[in-house]
Amino acid sequence: MLKIRLARGGAKKRPYYSIVIADSHSPRDGRFIEKVGSYNPLLKKDDPNRIVVKQERIQEWLGKGAQPTDRVARELSKLGITQWTAGNNPKKGEPGQKAKERAEERAQREADRAAAAAEAAAAPAEEAPAEEAPAEEAAAEAAPEAAAAEEAPAAEAAAEEAAPAAEEAAPAEGEEQA
C-alpha cells in the first residue's frame, strides 16, 4: 500500500520534512518513490513557504490509491486538495474492565459503610433516651468528686515543679551578686 507521508530531515531541534510517496512498509526516513513537496514547521503558519507541494502529482497519486497520513491529510485539506475530518473515538477515554470492577467494589464498600453508620447512629439514638436519665444523675453525683480528685494532684504537681525551679534560681542569683 502506498502512503503520502512526511520524511524527516534537518538537524536536532530543527525539523524539516519532505512530503513523499512511499511504501507503507519502508522506514520513515528511508526509501521513497517520489518527493512531492516539503513542510517546514519552524515557519509561521501564514508563511506561503511553510508547505510547498506539487498539486498535480499529489492528485495523480491519490487517484492511484495512495493514502495520506493524518498529518499530511490535514495539511492538504488546508490547501484544498483533500477533505480531512477529525477522528472520533468515544471509547478511548473509557476506563478498562479492571478499573470498572474496582470502582464497583469501592462503591459497594462505601454503601456498606454508610448503611452501617446509619444503623449505628439509629440504634444508640433509640436506646439512649431510656438510659440518659439515670446516667445523668450518676454523672452529676460523680462529677464533683472527680473534679476534686483531679484538682488535688494537679496542685501537688504544680507545687513540685515550682519548688525545684525556685531552688535553681536562688543559687544563680547568689552567684551573680558575688
Curated annotation (Swiss-Prot):
Keyword Translocase appears in the UniProt entry: no
InterPro entries reported for this sequence: Ribosomal_bS16 (IPR000307), Ribosomal_bS16_CS (IPR020592), Ribosomal_bS16_dom_sf (IPR023803)
Ribosomal protein keyword on record: yes
Segments of this protein annotated with the region Disordered: 78-178
Bias (Low complexity): 114-127, 140-172
Molecular-function annotations in GO: structural constituent of ribosome
Gene Ontology biological process terms from the UniProt entry: translation
Any one cellular-component term (Gene Ontology): cytoplasm
Compositional bias segments (type: Basic and acidic residues): 91-113
Pfam families: Ribosomal_S16
Name of this protein: Small ribosomal subunit protein bS16
Native source species: Phenylobacterium zucineum (strain HLK1)
Source taxonomy: Bacteria, Pseudomonadati, Pseudomonadota, Alphaproteobacteria, Caulobacterales
